[in-house]
Amino acid sequence: MINGELIVDNFAGGGGASTGIELATGYSVDIAINHDPEAIKMHKANHPNTKHYCENVWAVDPVKACKGHPIGLAWFSPDCKHFSKAKGGKPKDKNIRGLAWVALRWAGLVRPRVIMLENVEEFKTWGPLNRRHHPIKSKQGRTFEKFVQQLTDLGYEVQFKELVAADYGAPTMRKRFFMIARCDGKPIVWPDPTHAPADSEEVKKGLLKPYVGAYTQLDFSLPCPSIFDTSEEIKEKYGIRAVRPLAQKTMDRIARGFIKFILNNPKPFIIQCN
């Protein structure tokens, strides 16, 4: 608890958001909810003092879970796959796309002082599906607008924006949608970036730190089989299993990266790993 207020993590997964919340506030989350037993096991290992619910988020009664305690922060990271462009043109699941509505349930029943929601940037396009379970382009964003309006009607000030993880020291350029809603009358304050490209003026002047490269998270002492080797060759050379051939889209993505970061890059990052 923070000053007597609970912290609740819906869609808690293995505990990534919970760990971030603890790093930011100094307090462990009080309640974590996830339907996956394996995810809950991992969450328990990392957050043993948290009350865990291995259930569908809709099955948990906010009033009973909170036992009369006020909520300082309720965090929501609903399933993103049925919004993400990474899913391509595959049919979407209306029920999964609608999981975010559980935030309104919590807002209406126990009124968290601050609500935060994280998802892919396409979350803003949330709208109705046609009979073939594909988004209706002419109605993109309609459901999202209703979602925001209902939070507003409940007395919340709502702001949202897209943030790039690298701007805050994470070794990834991943962009994510973030929403903050609060009902305590205090201003919503977004964090200022702490990092920028190494050749930016902000970094040159010492105002910001340079981006952290993904290579800092890689162990280059591990075997790195060629993308051109077969599964059998990799097993013989390294004694490990590997899927080959790679999917064509994966190969295309590797080719684009090679062209962008090696062939067309005046300062290519090259490392010998074998």
Residue ranges: model-predicted function:
Residues 11-15:
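Class I SAM-dependent methyltransferase "Motif I" SAM/SAH-binding loop
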Residues 33:
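The conserved SAM/SAH-binding core of class I Rossmann-like methyltransferase domains
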Residues 36:
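Conserved SAM/SAH-binding beta-strand->alpha-helix loop
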Residues 6-9:
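Conserved beta-strand elements of the Class I
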Residues 20-28, 46:
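A short, Lys/Arg-enriched amphipathic alpha-helix followed by its capping loop at the start of a domain
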